[in-house]
Amino acid sequence: MDPRSEVLLRQAELFQGPLLIAGAPADDLLGQLPQAQAWTWHAGDQAMLESRFAGRSHYGVEAPEAAFDSAVLFLPKSRELAAYLLNALASRLAGRELYLVGEKRGGIEGAAKQLQAFGKPRKLDSARHCQLWQVTIDQAPQAKPLESLAERFELALEDGPLQVVSLPGVFSHGRLDRGTALLLKHLDGLPGGHMLDFGCGAGVLGATLKRRYPQSRVTLLDVDAFAVAASRLTLAANGLEGEVISGDGIDAAPTELSLILSNPPFHTGVHTNYQASENLLKKSAVHLRKGGEMRLVANSFLRYQPLIEGALGNCQVRDEADGFRIYQATRG
């Protein structure tokens, strides 16, 4: 069980009524708290929670409409995302209790100061390198629309400026990361057909593909509901059409793809997790059509080339700069 869940269960008597658990991990916490509902923005966690606790978990960027008497937020990595989530929860809890739980190395002590906007926070427990905080909502805020927190910026690309809309919690929020910047220089000569932007984030790569290859069908895929929402906003801001889907890794992707393009993720919260990226490399052949291509950027220290060669039988390094490599491989 997640150590943060264990800290909650040390105070289980506080959580016996209708409770919303925001950012709920995919463990047995719902099984221990029978009146609780979960809210998650991670498609993999949602799939596991729904399979074990059918009808008790909500996936999306907005809190479920169902009533709750109190709520607990599992602290996310992004401080801006935490602020949005705390505001969304506090706006529904006037005079009632809001809890915040997180790991010390995830910044729980600093994040707890964000509770001061709603009342007088107090620390209830500290165990398993985690802390649990509580505040009674004396000053319930107005709920802020998610789009009001969007960061909008423009990228100067070869074929004209691209408008990017990013949301709190999305990878490289509000700026272009170095890996994607390098990959954007290597989008020439791609095979047309059905293209996939895997781990799409704010949709920079997918939007660029659709603009550069307008006759191709472009699908954007991410595990995170906020990334899915941001990608849709980015496409709309540029007058582009594309299919944006949520799913847990490459298994959720279409097959018979002409292209997989990716700056694959390797962080889950504050933890490093290479599973999604390694699955992408190992299973790429299942999703590419014959002659289809995979092109991706990754940190130079990651040993991805043997995995790509094992799946597709070939792999070349197109470029290396600034600590990143561009890999290219074709399904024979």
Curated annotation (Swiss-Prot):
It is found in: Cytoplasm. Its EC number is 2.1.1.172. It is an enzyme of class 2 (transferase). Keywords: Cytoplasm, Methyltransferase, rRNA processing, S-adenosyl-L-methionine, Transferase. It comes from the Bacteria. It catalyses: guanosine(1207) in 16S rRNA + S-adenosyl-L-methionine = N(2)-methylguanosine(1207) in 16S rRNA + S-adenosyl-L-homocysteine + H(+). The keyword Isomerase does not apply. This is Ribosomal RNA small subunit methyltransferase C. The keyword Ribosomal protein does not apply. Monomer. The lineage of its organism: Bacteria, Pseudomonadati, Pseudomonadota, Gammaproteobacteria, Pseudomonadales. One of its GO terms (cellular component) is cytoplasm.
